C-alpha cells in the first residue's frame, strides 16, 4: 500500500511529503506517538522503493504542530533508524499549521549510489 512519491535526479532522491498514516492500512492514528512510528516506517519504505537504504538519507525535514515537544517524540525512532550519532543525516524541525489534521509530516533527501 506504499504510495509515497518523489523525484529522482541522477543519484539524488527527494521524497514527497510523508504523513503519519499506517503504510499498510492508510489509517491515521490520532496520537503523536503512532504518527511518529508510521512516519519512520514510511521513510524506510520510500527510500527502499527508490533503490536505497536509510544509510543513503542525508537530510530529513519534519513539520510538527508543536516542535518544542515534538522533537522529544522523534528522538527514539530517530536513534533506532540512525543509531550512529556520528553518521546521522541533518534534521530540521519546523512548525506545522495548527489546523493541519496531522501531528507531523516530513520529507527527506537521499543520495543513492552516488
Regions found by a protein language model. Give the residues of each.
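Short, polar/acidic, helix-capping and beta-turn segments at strand->helix junctions
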Residues: 1-114
